[in-house]
Amino acid sequence: MGEGEMIGLHASVGRGALALALAFCAAPALAQADKPAGPGQSAPDAAAPQNGSEANEPAPGDIIVTAQKRSENIQKVPLAVSVVSEAQLKASGVTQFQDLGKIAPSLTVRPAEHPVNANVSLRGVGTFAFGIGVEPSVAVLVDEVPLAFQARAFTDLPDVERIEVLRGPQSTLYGKSASAGLINIITRQPTDTFHARFNVMGTTDSEYGGNFSLSGPISPQLGYVVSASYSNWDGNVRNLFNDKKVNGREAFNTRGKLRWEPASNVTITLSGNYLNGSTTVGRPFIRMDPTALLRKMPGQTQAVTMPGVTIGPDNQNISNNYNSRTKYEGGGGSLRGDVGLGDLTLVSITSYDKFRLNDYLDHDDTSSSAAVGNNIQVGQFHSQLFTQEVRLLSSSAKPFRYTLGAYYANVKFERPFLRGPAFSPANWYATSKSEQIAGFAQIDWEIVPHLILTGGGRVQNEKVSYTFRDNLAAPGSQFFSGSASDTAGTYRLSGRYEVTPDLMFFATYSTGYKGQTYDLTTGFNANRAAAGPIKPERSRDKEIGMRAQFLDRRVTFNLTYFDTNYKNLQAQTIETLADGTTNFRLTNVGGLNTKGVELDTTARIGSDLNLTGSLAYLDARYTSFPVAQCYPLQTVAQGCTGSPARQNLTGARAIQAPKWKFSVGADYSPSLGGNLKGVAQANWQYQSSVYYVAEDPQTFQKAYSIVNVGLGVRDKDRKWEIVAFVNNLFDVQYYPSLVNTAGNFGDNTGNKIATQAVLPRDFRRYGGLRLGVNF
């Protein structure tokens, strides 16, 4: 597939864009109004975030977010919202999407052997499933445009202005992919004057990269911003079979915007993006029974199948005779129009996105020359997404304000898959389609001074369909297809009381919804087809909180308590076949409760020192999961009973849900005389223990903490900056993902312990140098 095909917009999008542009150009004849405030804002009173270099400075005034689809002071929003600025990303050593969990404690990002299998969770809730068409519980948006695949986000974060993390169900305003929350990545807007930014970086372990951004006016009515980034890292795992490093990545991203203001009340923004990258895969064994044989085959010992590899918790070596890797390419565009109509703002967002990923995996993870050591897995993921949203916003300055909207989405997925030939053979092709239409509304009413009540609702209809062809099945049992439709509603009720301009209390009750889907993975058969789709996931959330600022708004203290119940949570379990092979199955968990406390705080001490702190206490447990799959090697004494074997996880802690997690950061810029200022940055992250598979001791990660630091010098006006940094200062080893692969190893007495790890970027301490120039 060529680059032009990837970024070309569907013809219907082009026709819609042309019609939208013509309609907006005609708007001045229909209404005389002030110029709209910009994307996501209501006219004429919402303030736009700064786009120049000074945007990185901690502002003494308001932090503006678009969590409720209009620009608001974060301290006035009755939701659990946290904002991460570009400066915080740099100070914390965060350059990739998967690093976000280090500075947003309620957020956990779990990597995998390739980006599609990685997943995101908020407050212990996420969708951990490999099947196509399975929606995430945490939506990811870029400039308010949704991504069909979360994998689309697992790359560099260039030209980011801020990242908004909305915790808890957000289905009322954002739809069915936000039943646990959402992440909105906001990129920079065109500036009124020319501005250029260049950044380069290199590390002691051979990572290098850079990015640039150019922005400015083309004419008084037309502005632009264009950015690009490139990064390359060999990895931190060595494949002894060919002496090459793996677990690395290479990525190129580019993004551009044109903002046209044909009239004082009209703003049209055309955006486009393209990405191209690859990853190399290496999952070292950190535990293995010394008597284990590959697929229980005589003679296939560790010394034969993994020569030179010393298995242990510090292992960074593998021996694979097949090059496990992924290659991906994606592109898309959006057209946004904002029209001021007196006290109203009409917003339209049209988007199209296309993404393709090819994955290649050494399925046995060895270099054995026997037939059993040459099992490979090859597949592709294709996605196409078209969306259209229209909303009407009233003025934020009035005591009664509202947001009305309609949304349409059409998404298509394809997945060809091949595995074999020695064991666990598979050869199938699946497609999944979804079409949804929704209407939503939210009303805010200040019934008496300082007391605001909010009510919102959403009604949506979705039709899902699939095809599945199993090329290895017996004639007559090869092809399946089906469809289902569902209409559902969600709502949100809240009240907030502003005691003073700097102190607010709120209470919120909201519901979430994630649509039904089909389990299109290896093993799909007539029984699964007859069972129909996996049930929709529903959630009910209660929150109370306080938003406070002190000392002339130099100290911010935001506290939230939440209690959320999930019914029919869509989750992935392990299915162990008669030969010991494990497949993954999608199922419904009867119930899950997640409750806890979140704290976000910042302090500006003088003009040189800025402190940040975030903490999350989480108690996430299954309230009903009596028939869960047993994990590999689980015994009767460990709770695996019955026929077929199963375990009761009711009352157990949810996976990937640490009880405690916090992040503390400091950014100090003392004057060094003249035009120079020093740079001293530190970030400390802590996470308590987690299971990656429920109650499986082989996937248990103990508590750990990581410290990142940086020292440098910069111009007082931030025209340039040089920072030397060290990540994982104390060289702490941890695993963001563990996989129990006992099904592939054993002897004539049964399967044996075998555990593999996905190593994080900072598995070992490393240093680097970062240079930035702004003018």
Regions found by a protein language model. Give the residues of each.
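C-terminal beta-signal and adjacent terminal beta-strands/loops
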Residues: 7, 565, 685-693, 713-775
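Membrane-embedded beta-barrel scaffold of Gram-negative outer-membrane proteins
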Residues: 334-340, 345-363, 498, 504-514, ...
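Periplasmic-side early beta-strands and strand-to-turn transitions of outer-membrane beta-barrels
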Residues: 184, 191-193, 201, 213-322, ...
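Acidic, small-polar-rich N-terminal luminal/periplasmic segments of exported/outer-membrane proteins
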Residues: 58-193, 544
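Gram-negative outer-membrane beta-barrel transporters
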Residues: 402-403, 453, 563-565, 587-691, ...
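N-terminal Sec signal peptide and the immediately downstream disordered periplasmic leader
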Residues: 2-92, 99-103, 264-265, 333, ...
